[in-house]
Amino acid sequence: MSHKSAEMYELKKKVEELKSYRGRATELVSLYIPAGYDINKVMQQLREEYGTAQNIKSKSTRKNVLGALERAMQHLKLYRKTPENGLALFVGNVSEQEGVSDIKLWAIVPPEPLKVRLYRCDQTFVTEPLEEMLRVKDAYGLITVEKNEATIGLLRGKRIEVIDDLTSNVPGKTRAGGQSARRYERIREQETHEFMKRIAEHAAKAFLPLLEKGELKGIIIGGPGPTKEEFVDGDYLHHELRKKVIGVVDISYHGEYGLRELVEKASDILSEHEAVKERKLIQDFFRHLVKDTGLITYGEREVRKALELGAVDTLLISEGYDKVRVKAKCNACGWEELKTMSEQEFHVYKKKLTHCPKCGSQNISFEKWDVAEELIKLAEESGAEVEIISLDTEEGQQFYKAFGGLGAFLRYKIQ
């Protein structure tokens, strides 16, 4: 996985976190500074906003907005100039308790250049410009064709989506002879022709907008018999879409299963596509498991140990993996406890651990960090590859459910 892909994964996690917060009033500050923009002008704008915020009537809202702006200005002093891809700052009071201030700041240098300049103080953080970066743009058009049905879909990233299911009125073959047979065959040919035109119209509606945006990388067509070749060779598809046909494949199924089979059968054509690479990767992981080669491991403790030893060749993390690492510490006697748990379990743990089990003090502090981000950092430090496994493929779902979404290919066997 490229460094950019790892950045995209971490960005997605941060966006999800930011979207989970809601202010008690319009007191959450979002600031987008585009690539190449003068950071001194931003500082000037924030000073002006600070002056305006002093007129806010609500005492608590005024305090929180001023506190957020102070944190933002303090942070911007760390930069001599705007980072190469721009900078997004999110600051605000995220405390769940009324009257308690917990102002946090997130500074994000995005993996792609920011083009928008924005300042907003609202009840929620503005994440849309970052979400647009996360949207998978490259797509492959998929069409399965039979005499009496067709399915149009898209392969976008690792997800196959059905756009249209079409059925025809093409009659079956008849045993009648003579003129009746010839007339029946003409009707059949005409109905087939009309159905092909309808498939092409729906394909144009689905694919041409993507082509205009430069997002359509190719079209793959499949079916069980000669109908697919008739569709491709006939003058049905829009001339610009005909140029994008990169493969015609024999398949047995139709509908959503047909689209899945089409992607699988076209794996040579799509060898560099994410969904095909992911399927092969997880199949290799399962193969090592069945053969008991000792060259894979899974589970947080085992993967962490392998990373610390520098034994990991490729780290596999599911998009669904959401564990956090929590350190509880007694500030009176120094007692510490380190655990891995879900975000929900952390809230329960925090509520229950009111007294130090060693000295009874209530002076307990908690530190929390994302396990996936920690393991990615360990992988990068040891030169290991990182692959993010989606939940959009059957293999990705199996990896998440059977192995908790965490595994690794090893460079060598470890004890």
Curated annotation (Swiss-Prot):
CC terms in the record's Gene Ontology section: cytoplasm
Function noted in UniProt: Directs the termination of nascent peptide synthesis (translation) in response to the termination codons UAA, UAG and UGA.
MF terms in GO: translation release factor activity, codon specific
Pfam families to which the protein is assigned, alphabetical: eRF1_1, eRF1_2, eRF1_3
Chain's gene name: prf1
Location(s) in or outside the cell: Cytoplasm
Protein name: Peptide chain release factor subunit 1
Main location: cytoplasm
Assembly, per entry: Heterodimer of two subunits, one of which binds GTP.
PANTHER family in the cross-refs: PEPTIDE CHAIN RELEASE FACTOR SUBUNIT 1
Keywords, sorted A to Z: Cytoplasm, Protein biosynthesis
Top-rank taxon, per record: Archaea
Organism: Thermococcus onnurineus (strain NA1)
Family: Belongs to the eukaryotic release factor 1 family.
